[in-house]
Amino acid sequence: MTWPSIIILILVIIGGLTFFYIQPKQQAKTESIYTDALNAMVRGDKRTALKHLRDVVKQDTNHVDAYLQMGDILREEGNALAAIKIHQSLTVRPNLKNDVKIHIHRSLALDYNQISQLAKARREVELLLKLDKKNLWANEFLLALFEKQQDWDKATQISKIIQKVKQLQDPTQIARFLVLKGMDKHEKGKVDEAIKTFDIAAKTDPNYEKTYLCLGDIYLVKRDLVKAIDNWEKYALLNPENGKMIYSKIEAALFDLGRFSEVEKFYERIVDKDPSNLSALTKLANVLEEKGEHNSALSLVEDALSKNQTSIHAHLMKLKLSVQVSKPNELSNHIDKIIQLLTSNNEK
């Protein structure tokens, strides 16, 4: 063997020894620093984590996870542009696994979203979905994006996909988007299209009350008071708390139609379904009082008080009904009771 051959052989042996003994130690050191970075992130010490991550990529430029974490921390610190630069540089690396590509696109979507570049954020999410079309995070990100952009058709479409991925049904969410779409059409003067959209919403979820509020309002504009009343009543029955806000609308529409007697029947239906609805109950008592049925009105209020002694609303209604028939000392006692309740509520 010639001297040059011997020298080459020695160099090869030295190189091999370097690879098998020194390289693993270097790799072990790099992973140890990366672990320190992750621990710092868990503690919330982002500055230390960032320092460790920078040390990692100096020692190992192929450590993609470290680059990803660096970019994510920079974004969280408010430096989305620097995060984009790091994350974007990873997209051209060859032979990346799908889960790494998914992480890159997710990070870029969040980067762009932070600086309100929504079109680019959407593009990254769509690239992610090409790798994993059932990715729940990506679909929910798109849903939030479409809601922000008030694109109700796409929001409805994505909502259906999410429900399929989650293996659940949420007709209320679909109905909500349809109602928002209908409201947009109404604002643009497309009344008939709005009504059709609201009707679809009602079929999608018959218990989503806002549909009927919108239908009632739109039929009022069309002066179709019969349909307006029907839909408002559905709203009031489904949403007793907010339904009281439209009692005056229903009364006015019934009076316009000359259907005075139906005001009493309307409040009776509300009270029958929800006996604790004091707003409807006092309205009904007022109607009975106006008809001269004083005793029936008083009996109605007293029945409500037997179930809820602390209702100031009911006590005031009883006081109103008692003014002309009760003795002064009885009225005084009743007023004292109301003052006591008011004082007690204020002290709480």
Language model region names:
Residues 29-62, 69-85, 89, 110, ...:
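Alpha-helical segment of the N-proximal tetratricopeptide repeat
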Residues 42, 76, 114, 148, ...:
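Register position in tetratricopeptide repeats
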Residues 55-56, 89-94, 127-128, 162, ...:
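Canonical positions in the second alpha-helix
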Residues 61, 95, 99, 133, ...:
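Short coil turns that delineate tetratricopeptide repeat
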Residues 66, 100, 104, 138, ...:
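TPR alpha-solenoid repeat register
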Residues 69, 103, 107, 141, ...:
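Canonical tetratricopeptide repeat
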